[in-house]
Curated annotation (Swiss-Prot):
Compositionally biased spans, kind Basic and acidic residues: 115-129
Composition bias type Low complexity, residue spans: 91-100
TM helices/strands, residue ranges: 487-507, 520-540
Keywords: Membrane, Merozoite, Transmembrane, Transmembrane helix
UniProt topology in membrane: Multi-pass membrane protein
Protein name: Uncharacterized protein PF3D7_1205000
Length: 781
């Protein structure tokens, strides 16, 4: 290239720019760069040679020849100089040309370093991918395979590829990697980025060639490289987001999810397989034609390697020869396939479903298809699977007994019970709806009558009562509606004590004289309500408790001080309030004869537990505490669980308690005559045992008289209430029994607990001749 030639082109361009001004400026720029384009064209041949070699040869050539570089599109643009720089070169501006050359050399050095770093990065990436492909385990490859299937599922939803988990995994990887092998599957361009990550260890050489071609194509066009890097970044970001969502929420629920652990996966595939009779030749091209002709058809690929209908997970990496079966089912989706499988399980339509396919295929293919269908739903119903082996090599044939029923007796019973339940429920629903319709129809008629009455000028009822003899229509008042009174009548018959029935009947009686029906029904209600009340009173036993103690004292007797107020001394102290003896506090009891002491506590107070735990020697126990009583004193004993003391036994002790009370006066304790020897052996209940204390002025009384008045007893027993006729429930009822005594002189008294001598302590249940004591009250009155 000479500078003179450049000057001539400069003059031509300047004159041309002056004539055409700014309109033809772009065309002149092209003429100015003509020489540079020639240089670029001469270097394109070298670029093609360099691209045909691998990346390692390129680095060696560049290091050996410092001035020669492989020029891609980006490098060609670097050699293009601007117009002012070109004019300076033409005008022999040596200084500018030298500076430009220096800048150009610096740029070349920087680009050389950049290319070297890029080449090193690519080599590192290749080595890293190569090592990962060698060291990756089987589970990682399986996960990548599932990702590809999930990616293909989003693109094609009408293609179902049903295979055994491990066999389809090995076969599909060999199809995707070995593109030169016959019977391959064509990977679309959208899946090349994912296919590069799925390389088995046995195919390392082919993975290297694949990566070298990728790097060579990447070095050809840097602009395309930038765009592809951006697309790769977006794919990585999208993949990470997708992975996070799947880790948190799980895989999306689609038709390929497993129903059972043994159910095969329904994976959506991008590629279609060819027909069964093509003998595995030109699979991809033939199936593309099929897709163009029949766009609505679905292709099912069924590969099976079963051992007695049990999926084997052994020898995953062993490349075994497995025949591939193709079945075309028109107008089906995954749900239809599952429905057909369920029909096969019941043994109803399986022969008609696969009839055409069985006529075209050989026995091996038929066995292979049946085994895969059994794996979809691994329930064997009358199948002869005696000769089925691991690899389905032998020509075994599975016979189906269509004459036999596939339903078990349990299934028949459940089916019959379900039918009975459905029939009963449908019958009830039909009758309920029929009754509802009748009620609805009745009220609609009433509403229509009300509307006609409102629209008519006079309140004339549409339904007129006719007299048979006279055939005279009687007008009825619209407000004379006895429906509410009728409802009240039927509700009153249900109630046991119909107070509201009577009140409602009286209220409805207060109606105008024209409302004859309402009045008649109100009178009927009142009459029956009164009858029900009378019947209720006569048949009901009202249980009125007898008062514990009730004494009426005349005012003059109190004024005369005949019965002065009582005094209660306890532990040498006078108590104006009452004393309570129960299980809330600890009390001591001693034997009447041996003076042995027994203690009572919570849940062990004068009951069956107390006797079975303490087992006293005597049948009479006295309180260890002495209570000094004077004047009017009230003593009350509350009995718990136990029977009443029989009337026959009461007759035996009745003479000791006759003629003690005069009218409503207190019982004078001095009149009591019962002693320790008079107490019967079979008595059970409580008692008050008192002994008189002699003061100094009574010392003149002789000793026989003192011995005669030594102790006096008054007994308390559980008795039936006067107004209570429920004798059966008295066993569990707590009944208080009390009496008011008058002590003229001071007595030392003890509370007594009595039970029969013949009682058994080890008896579990409460005996019939025993009663518990819950509480004892002593109160000055």
């Amino acid at each position: 290239m000479s500078y003179n030639d450049g000057s001539e082109e400069e003059n031509d361009s300047n004159t041309y720019i002056h004539d055409e001004k700014k309109k033809k400026k772009k065309k002149n720029n092209k003429n100015a760069y003509a020489l540079i384009n020639e240089v670029n064209y001469s270097q394109e041949d070298e670029q093609e040679v360099i691209h045909n070699t691998n990346s390692e040869d390129e680095t060696s050539n560049r290091k050996g020849n410092g001035c020669v570089y492989s020029l891609s599109d980006q490098n060609v643009e670097d050699h293009i100089i601007s117009l002012p720089e070109y004019l300076d070169l033409i005008n022999n501006n040596n200084n500018n040309s030298n500076s430009y050359k220096m800048k150009k050399e610096k740029k070349k050095k920087k680009k050389k370093k950049k290319n070297q770093t890029d080449e090193e990065n690519m080599k590192n990436k290749k080595d890293h991918i190569y090592q990962n492909n060698i060291t990756n385990q089987q589970n990682d490859i399986k996960n990548d395979y599932k990702k590809i299937n999930h990616h293909n599922m989003n693109n094609k939803k009408n293609k179902i590829f049903c295979q055994d988990d491990q066999n389809i995994f090995n076969i599909n990887h060999t199809f995707q990697i070995h593109e030169t092998v016959q019977n391959n599957l064509i990977i679309p361009p959208s899946e090349t980025c994912l296919a590069s990550d799925i390389i088995q260890p046995s195919d390392t050489t082919q993975s290297n060639t694949y990566l070298n071609e990728a790097t060579a194509s990447q070095n050809d066009d840097n602009n395309n490289e930038d765009s592809s890097n951006e697309m790769g970044m977006f794919k990585k970001i999208f993949y990470r987001i997708k992975k996070i969502i799947v880790d948190k929420k799980g895989t999306p629920i689609t038709n390929e999810n497993d129903v059972d652990n043994d159910m095969c996966e329904l994976n959506v595939m991008e590629n279609n397989m060819n027909n069964i009779h093509s003998n595995n030749n030109n699979i991809s091209t033939h199936m593309d034609d099929v897709i163009e002709d029949e766009s609505n058809e679905e292709v099912f690929v069924i590969n099976r390697n079963t051992d007695g209908y049990i999926n084997t997970r052994e020898n995953i990496n062993v490349s075994t020869h497995v025949t591939r079966q193709m079945i075309n089912l028109s107008e089906l989706n995954p749900n239809d396939l599952l429905c057909n499988v369920s029909e096969y399980e019941e043994g109803q339509n399986i022969n008609s479903l696969w009839n055409d396919n069985n006529n075209n295929n050989n026995n091996n293919n038929n066995n292979f298809l049946v085994g895969s269908l059994n794996a979809l739903h691994p329930i064997n119903h009358n199948l002869r699977n005696e000769n089925i082996h691991n690899d389905n090599i032998n020509n075994t044939h599975i016979n189906y007994d269509n004459n036999n029923s596939y339903e078990s007796p349990i299934h028949i019973l459940s089916f019959s019970f379900k039918n009975i339940y459905n029939k009963i429920s449908s019958y009830i629903n039909e009758h309920i709806t029929h009754i509802k319709e009748k009620i609805k129809k009745y009220w609609l008629e009433r509403v229509q009558e009300a509307n006609t009455q409102l629209n008519s000028p006079r309140p004339v009822h549409t339904r007129n009562t006719t007299n048979i003899n006279t055939n005279i229509n009687i007008n009825e008042d619209e407000n004379d509606d006895p429906s509410c009174v009728q409802i009240l009548f039927f509700m009153g018959l249900i109630c046991k004590f119909p107070i509201l029935w009577i009140i409602g009947s009286i209220v409805f009686c207060i109606t105008p004289s024209e409302h004859r029906k309402t009045k008649t029904w109100s009178l009927v209600n009142t009459f029956f309500a009164l009858l029900s009340i009378i019947y209720f009173i006569t048949t009901t036993n009202f249980r009125l408790r007898k008062p514990t103690f009730f004494v009426i004292l005349e005012q003059n007797v109190e004024n005369k001080n005949t019965y002065p107020k009582g005094i209660l001394k306890y532990n040498n102290m006078i108590h104006h309030k009452h004393i309570i003896i129960d299980q809330s506090s600890l009390h001591k009891w001693k034997d009447l004869h041996t003076n042995k002491v027994y203690k009572t506590s919570e849940n062990y107070f004068l009951n069956r537990n107390f006797l079975s735990s303490q087992k006293p020697d005597s049948n009479i126990l006295l309180s260890d505490t002495i209570y000094k009583l004077l004047n009017r004193i009230q003593v009350t004993v509350t009995f718990g669980k136990g029977n009443i003391y029989s009337s026959d036994n009461i007759e035996k002790i009745k003479p000791f308690f006759q003629n003690l009370r005069i009218n409503m006066d207190p019982i004078s304790y001095d009149k009591l005559t019962m002693t320790d020897e008079d107490i019967p052996d079979d008595f059970f209940g409580s008692g008050l045992r008192c002994e008189r204390t002699y003061n100094n002025h009574n010392q003149n009384i002789n000793e026989p008289q003192q011995n005669k008045e030594k102790e006096k007893w008054y007994l308390f027993w559980k008795e039936e209430e006067i107004n209570n006729s429920h004798n059966k429930n008295i066993y569990n009822i707590s009944i208080p029994v009390g009496e008011i005594f008058f002590f003229k002189s001071e007595y030392n008294c003890r509370i007594a607990f009595l039970y029969p001598k013949s009682i058994l302590y080890d008896q579990n249940d409460i005996p019939s001749n025993f009663v518990e004591i819950q509480k004892i009250i002593i109160k000055p009155f």
